[in-house]
Amino acid sequence: MQLALAAKYIGASMATLGLGGAAIGIALVFVALINGTSRNPSLRATLFPQAILGFALAEACGLFCLMMSFLLLYAV
């Protein structure tokens, strides 16, 4: 019983490691946006929607990891 509970906690903590990857991905998206805008300010209107799309995809991956962590903790 306690081994299964420990395995559940370890699995949930391993699933949350993806949140760190999502945070790094979001940071890299906006670093690229700032870098591109500083090099060529006239491209801001083109770069911003692509940056928001990249942000949304990176955030979705992080939310999937968080959802899996909650599922491991409370549903299994």
From Swiss-Prot:
Complexes and interactors: F-type ATPases have 2 components, CF(1) - the catalytic core - and CF(0) - the membrane proton channel. CF(1) has five subunits: alpha(3), beta(3), gamma(1), delta(1), epsilon(1). CF(0) has three main subunits: a, b and c.
Keywords: CF(0), Hydrogen ion transport, Ion transport, Lipid-binding, Membrane, Mitochondrion, Transmembrane, Transmembrane helix, Transport
Mode of membrane association: Multi-pass membrane protein
Transmembrane residue ranges: 14-34, 52-72
Record lineage: Eukaryota, Fungi, Dikarya, Ascomycota, Saccharomycotina
The organism of origin for this protein: Debaryomyces hansenii (strain ATCC 36239 / CBS 767 / BCRC 21394 / JCM 1990 / NBRC 0083 / IGC 2968) (Yeast)
One annotated Gene Ontology cellular component of this protein: mitochondrial membrane
Site positions (Reversibly protonated during proton transport): E59
Localization per record: Mitochondrion membrane
MF GO annotations: lipid binding; proton transmembrane transporter activity
SUPFAM superfamilies per UniProt: F1F0 ATP synthase subunit C (SSF81333)
Entry-linked Gene3D superfamilies: F1F0 ATP synthase subunit C
One GO process term, biological-process aspect: proton motive force-driven ATP synthesis
Protein name in UniProt: ATP synthase subunit 9, mitochondrial
HAMAP family (alphabetical): ATP_synth_c_bact
Functional description taken from the UniProt entry: Mitochondrial membrane ATP synthase (F(1)F(0) ATP synthase or Complex V) produces ATP from ADP in the presence of a proton gradient across the membrane which is generated by electron transport complexes of the respiratory chain. F-type ATPases consist of two structural domains, F(1) - containing the extramembraneous catalytic core and F(0) - containing the membrane proton channel, linked together by a central stalk and a peripheral stalk. During catalysis, ATP synthesis in the catalytic domain of F(1) is coupled via a rotary mechanism of the central stalk subunits to proton translocation.
Chief location bin: mitochondrion
Family: Belongs to the ATPase C chain family.
PROSITE patterns linked to this entry: ATPASE_C
